[in-house]
Structures are given as C-alpha cells and as structure tokens.
Amino acid sequence: MKTLLSTCISIFISFHFLAQASTYNLTVKVSGIEVKKGMVEYGLFRDAEKFTKIGGTYRMIRVKVDASEETVTFHNLPKGKYAVCIYLDENNNDQCDKNFFGIPTERFAFSNNLRPLLSAPSFEACSIYLNENKSIIIRADY
C-alpha cells in the first residue's frame, strides 16, 4: 500500500512540474509614452477572430502611467501564437475613445510595432510565437 501511495504521489508531482515547465512568461515594455496620465491597457490575444474585438482578449492588464516607459509581464502562458494591442487611456474611462469615423483618438500600438494605415493590422502580422520566456518592446511614440 505504501508503494502504491508513493507511486501515485510521484506521478502527481511529475505531472505538476511538467505542467509548469510548459508555460512561459511574456514581458511587454511600452516605450515613448509622452502623456504621463491615465492608464496603459495591455490586451493579449490568442485568437485571430477575436483580435482587437471588445471582449476578445485572452488576458488584460491595466497599469497607471507613471513614466515614459511601462512594463508588465503575462505569466503562465501556454506555448502558441499571441498578439498584443495596447492603448493609452488618457482620460481613464476604460475605453479607447474614437472619433466620428471610428478612428481612435487615444494612442494605441501593436506587437511587432506595426502601424495601421486604413485598418487594424491582422493577428498574423502582429503575432509572436511563444515557446520560451520572451520580452518585447512596443513603441507608442507616434
């Protein structure tokens, strides 16, 4: 009985460590923040269909703007493709304000530092493949 219990505990511990080893961290630094007020919202996406859609984030982090650079880390992410979209919520109203034509009036940026011309970039163009701990920089200086 002791052997069976020891074996079960060993298997459980092994699976626990394997599960932890297959997750990674993504650190995202936003640089070039000119207006030091409001919040930076980091949206992490895993699904191309939900990319840039309200409620489509896999995870989200909001931090108060205190400096020209802000950094957050998304922890325990499974291996796969991700894309990041950030916006600077200067008036702290929990939404990306837009003008009459639907164009954001608050600063925003995407992973891979893609700059949209007439529409948001695709998930594929912004995607990052995560198979190890990674750090990326997104420039908000436009």
Q: What are the residue ranges of the model-derived segments?
A:
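A short, amphipathic beta-strand motif
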Residues: 24-32
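Acidic, glycine-anchored loop motifs typical of Ca2+
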Residues: 90-97
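Extracellular beta-sheet/turn segments enriched in Thr/Pro/Gly and aliphatic residues
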Residues: 106-142
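Short proline/glycine- and polar residue-rich coil/turn motifs
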Residues: 63-68, 130
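A short tyrosine-centered beta-strand micro-motif
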Residues: 82-86
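Bacterial Sec-dependent N-terminal signal peptides
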Residues: 1-23
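Short, ordered, surface-exposed loop/turn motifs in non-cytosolic proteins
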Residues: 35-45, 50-52
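Short, flexible loop/turn segments at beta-strand junctions in immunoglobulin-like
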Residues: 74-77
